[in-house]
Amino acid sequence: MNTATGVIALLVLATVIGCIEAEDTRADLQGGEAAEKVFRRSPTCIPSGQPCPYNENCCSQSCTFKENENGNTVKRCD
């Protein structure tokens, strides 16, 4: 077996193994167990003093406009 044939055989083997492993984590469009594994949300929140795009992401659940070091007004978590 020459080098080119060996490389092709390894690529085919890697593709087959990849397809078998991907079978375990494919998205379940019905909202079953696979969907819960793939689409998991982190329970982290934005600490106080950090910029906040939305109030619900702040640990304090509160976001107000404050002046930053440049003199601009930005929303920050309380």
From Swiss-Prot:
SUPFAM superfamilies for this protein: omega toxin-like
Signal peptide bounds: 1-22
Subcellular location: Secreted
Pfam family, one: Omega-toxin
InterPro entries cross-referenced by the UniProt entry: Omega-atracotox, Omega-atracotox_CS
One of the GO biological process terms: defense response
GO molecular function, one term: toxin activity
UniProt GO cellular component terms: extracellular region
Record key words, sorted: Calcium channel impairing toxin, Cleavage on pair of basic residues, Disulfide bond, Ion channel impairing toxin, Knottin, Neurotoxin, Secreted, Signal, Toxin, Voltage-gated calcium channel impairing toxin, Voltage-gated sodium channel impairing toxin
Tissue: Expressed by the venom gland.
Keyword Transport attributed: no
Main location: secreted
Entry keyword annotation includes RNA-binding: no
Critical for insecticidal activity (site feature) positions: 51, 68, 76
Propeptide regions on this chain: 23-41
SS bond list: 45-59, 52-63, 58-77
Annotated function: Insecticidal toxin that reversibly and voltage-independently blocks both mid-low- (M-LVA) and high-voltage-activated (HVA) calcium channels (Cav) in cockroach DUM neurons. Also causes a modest block of insect sodium channel currents (Nav). Induces potent excitatory symptoms, followed by flaccid paralysis leading to death in house crickets.
Similarity annotation: Belongs to the neurotoxin 08 (Shiva) family. 01 (omega toxin) subfamily.
Swiss-Prot/TrEMBL domain comment: The presence of a 'disulfide through disulfide knot' structurally defines this protein as a knottin.
Additional observations: This toxin comes from a male specimen. It is observed that propeptide sequences coming from male specimen are identical but have only limited homology with the female paralogs, but the reason is unknown.
Name of the protein in its database record: Omega-hexatoxin-Ar1d
Organism, scientific name: Atrax robustus (Sydney funnel-web spider)
